[in-house]
Design a protein with these regions (language model features):
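ATP-dependent carboxylate-amine ligase
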Residues: 1-198
Length: 198
């Protein structure tokens, strides 16, 4: 294959949704969604991407980390330390949010925030977002942090932290209805939405 052909194909490559995919909200932030997997050993890769972008503000949202040995608190603490060096604000979401062990100074300065639910984190992001900022969302798939993007127009009505569905919210498309109406089972009219934008 010629270098010209390779360059042409690379130039038109679209990332897979939820694998560090780029999503721009008109007049709002840009999301980098990395919500398909979150093995501990790979956390620094998306953080390096966040470091490399130019933005008026950079925020990092972490849900759940997977695939690590040893003490989970130590892993979340290390993840927080790495993120605080890159992001203006670090947000932890879910049952493990307290494991960041952020220093008191970071709490006082608003460098760190913790939310028990994805719904609360979404409300906070929507209430504090500025045009031109970049928000990197990173988590294992079971927390469905893609809802942070999908809720930007208020469309999300399915808010359990873990619904049990292995399908992403893009695939399930049940996020527009309360969980009690669909139980996390993808509908028969499932459609692909949320294609990455450049």
């Amino acid at each position: 294959m010629s270098p010209t052909t390779i360059a042409a194909r690379v130039a038109t490559f679209q990332p897979v949704v939820r694998r560090l995919s780029l999503h721009q909200v008109p007049g709002g932030p840009t999301f980098l969604l990395d919500t398909a997997k979150a093995p501990y050993h790979s956390l620094k890769l998306p953080l390096e991407t966040l470091r490399s972008v130019s933005a008026v503000r950079k925020r990092f949202v972490l849900g759940q980390i997977s695939d690590y040995a040893g003490n989970s608190t130590a892993k979340y603490r290390e993840a927080y330390r790495a993120a605080r060096e890159v992001a203006d604000e670090v947000i932890f979401v879910g049952a493990t949010a307290h494991k960041a062990c952020a220093p008191d100074d970071d709490l006082a300065q608003g460098k760190f925030r913790a939310f028990e639910t994805v719904e609360a984190a979404s409300a906070y992001l929507k209430g504090t977002a500025v045009a031109g900022e970049v928000i990197l969302a990173k988590s294992a798939s079971n927390l469905h942090l893609e809802r942070l993007l999908l809720d930007w127009d208020g469309a999300v009505r399915c808010w359990p932290n873990e619904c049990g569905s292995r399908a992403s919210c893009f695939e399930c498309n049940g996020y527009r209805a309360p969980f009690s109406e669909h139980g996390g089972r993808p509908g028969r009219t499932t459609q692909r939405v949320g294609r990455p934008q450049t």
